[in-house]
Amino acid sequence: MEGVLAASLFYYGCIMTLEDLHKQVDLDLKIDDTELDLESIRTPQLHNKYLKLYTKFSLQYKKAKDDYSTVYKFKWEYYCGKSAPEVYQENPFDLKVLKSDVYIYLNADAELQQADQKQEYLKQVCNYLERVLREINNRNWNIKNTIEWKKFIHGE
């Protein structure tokens, strides 16, 4: 799926590729143990940054789901022979498909597949950002444990 969707998320109205997002998270979540006080202060900023991204991608995911439903309905009507005559003049479809076989045509439809891939891709981005936000929420706990470990090592 990544190969098909290796196009940037900008293609889907987003701002970066998923790979770019992974790299940015790797950089942002790295804790510099020589400046734990500054790292602790950075936590709310990181949370805000990724919460904004999560919100943006969640809205895009919702829109992608709605777009998929719209395309699905249009294609279902098309393959069931229920579309307007103009649709068939523009894009003829002379087969009579049994209702039990419509799903075969829907599953193989390129436009519907693309809408589904977009939806799934954005879903994965949202899931990833949810996990990133959880990790950011645990960041201060990790910093606190690092400070306590350093105190223990130095006999304090």
Model-identified regions with their sequence ranges:
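Acidic, Ala/Val/Gly-enriched low-complexity intrinsically disordered segments
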Residues: 2-7
